[in-house]
Amino acid sequence: MTFISNIQSVAKYESKLLIRSWFFRVFTVLAVTIITFFNFQLFVSEDSGGFWIATAIPSNIPYLILLLLNTGQAVIAIFLASDFLKRDKKLDTSEVFYVRPLSNAEYVIGKIWGNLRVFLLLNLIIMAITAAFNLTLGEVDWMAYLLYFLLISVPTLIFIIGLAIFLMLVLKNQALTFVLLLGYIGLTVFYIEDKLYYLFDYMAYSLPLVKSSIVGFSNWEVILNHRGIYFLAGLAFVFFTISLFRRLPNSSHSNYPWLVISFCTLMLAFVCGYWHIHSILYQSDIRATYTKINNQYVSTPKMFIHEYDLSVEQHPEDFLSEVTVKGVALDSSAVFTFCLNPGLTIHSVHSAGQQLKFKRDKQIVLVDFGTKHAKGDTISATFRYDGQIDNSFCYLDIPPEVLQASNKKFLFNIDKQYSFQTKNYLMLTPETYWYPRAGTSYSDKNPDWQQTYFSNYRLKVKPLPGLVPLSQGEGKCDEEGVYSFKGDYPSQTLSLVIGDYQQKSAYADSILYSVWHLRDHDYFTASFDSIHDTIPWLIRNVKEQLARQYKLDYPFKRFSIVEVPVQFASYERAWSQAQETVQPEMVLFPEKGAIFWELDVKRQVKNHIRWSGNNEISLQEAQMRTFSNFAWMFLQTEGDYNFSSGSRGRGNLSSTANPYFLFPQIYNFRYNIYSSEWPVANRAIELYLQKKSENEGWERQINGLSNNEKANLLLEKHTFKELLADVEQRNLQNNIVGLEASRLFARSEINMGV
């Protein structure tokens, strides 16, 4: 018999024995029953609360199901895989193979393949059941079923089966093997979790695996490398098992090649593990380098740019841009400092038709204008560059532990990205420094880098065929497919999003309100069919409520909610409450609002009718309530609330800032206060206007202390500056700054009789 046919013969025999096992049969029945019931609740039952993050993004359905199945089969595989060695020895179940001229490799691989293929068949059955239910939604991501099967189930099964059999041969004790492996599983799931950058997460619980319906996976290299660790380690244990197997080999030297192969495979697994850690640590190192370079150039001469002319041409793999800046010299010099994302390559810089010399130091661009310009002189320069954005340059002020913290919604682990660039999608926000800006980015030595100015922006964009660009200002398209944008007012920054967008819009008080969604992502229009004429009135109420509360009016002629990939992440800064999710005139909202249960609008309308009880409400009223709940999200200062167990059985409540809070639209994008001595001056004004230091009595009832009381206690023990630099107090930073702002303005309020 050939090598393959021998393996198939052994595998066939082993598979039959495994299928006849009552242990496996019980697990199969339980798995099928539980998964079927879960799918029924998810797709069919109207009494369930809904699970919008799973159904909004079709790829999340196989992700969730296989993750749940993976937990059970990883435990069961330990018992069943290690059992065949005990069974062979105790019951002589494989004597028929021992007398045949089989190599140890054929026998061991056949045994393991026999176990593995039964589990893989169970996975296929579970996926088929899930896909059948999934078809009721009308939107199935078939590729996601295959990818998650290969990324979650296959590496886990190969690793745990190979490790179990290897330990059985080494320890020669099944009970001890069970104890060690079950302890290992418990340790990785409940204690280690995502520690050490989720290196030990062999079941893929902490690995960011959410696949966007817009850009797909945003961290392919991390995923393949991480799953490769356990796939290769599992193969290495299988090869070690062949060389250690207690059976006379066909040749006295036949074990040596397998030892060499096993060591080489194990080394490859270690290399993948090393690369996983190294790539993450490299991000921290390069970020420190970028900050160090900013510190070096933060005090060099720069200019105030009051006019930008930008031209962007989208390519499948990158983008080409030509930017002309015009401004005023703030210092007397011939060389001025600019900052541009280090992933972008500058091809030329010229002014008035003359090529200018420039020096590039990572993100810093030093442009030599040839002659010295006096302070106040008008200067212009044109930059031509292309490339891809380096995301590691973003958020240099955010501590590594915050950047590396998991972004988890239930069991769904979402990657965090700050820009996107694929053949069908492009998203660039100001944080990426996708166009040259005067001075440097974040410096931890000198706050002068924070000083920003309002500039006039004109933007021309040539997208790929069939795609629509979005930016600040009204977009106009010419006959050649080039879009032009010009803002109504000077702005501090500019953003650009290009995708296969469609628009739903309504006018209210001469302002154009729009929802820009990706093609085939309009799941909400039908749920508001009874209130199309009422929506402008509801929007007007939200706008007026925002103006009444903060005594500031919305200044722009447009407001858009733009659908972006779910992996897009932002952070609150020490000097401003504005996050990248909120841009002038627009909010960048996760695809289909997947992370918010309020966005399951179809179910929400039904729930409002069902929950009305004796006070029956009309379909129109239910739709109005659903719309109002959605709009309310943009008026809340807090985002997620997290409940945890405290000491002596008390609960503990913590909250994070709402990244979609609209306050920056009426304050940050129209006003800016800067002080080199008080870098948080602008933040203090924000929080003073919001009266952040008030209205938290209900938190005291849960925590025993409100966040303001906690902040007061901290201010008694530490200085204001120390608390701003303390990463552990980030959740209380608003309260700390708000209390200081209230104290700062208290005397003025008394003098004015406020």
Model segments located where?
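Hydrophobic alpha-helical transmembrane segments of multi-pass membrane transport/permease proteins
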Residues: 20-45, 67-77, 180-189
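Selective transmembrane-helix segments that form parts of the transport pathway or gating/packing helices
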Residues: 23, 27, 73, 102-133
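Hydrophobic helix-coil surface modules that form long, contiguous segments used
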Residues: 24-40, 265-271, 446-663, 672-730
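Terminal transmembrane helical anchor/hairpin motif
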Residues: 42-57, 174-253, 275-292
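Long, hydrophobic alpha-helical segments
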Residues: 61-87, 122, 323, 383
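N-terminal, polar/Ser/Thr-rich
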Residues: 199-208, 216-225, 253-319, 347, ...
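A surface-exposed beta-strand-loop module
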Residues: 332-335, 342-407, 445-448, 480, ...
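Extended, low-hydrophobicity, Ser/Thr/Pro/Gly-biased non-transmembrane segments
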Residues: 384-501
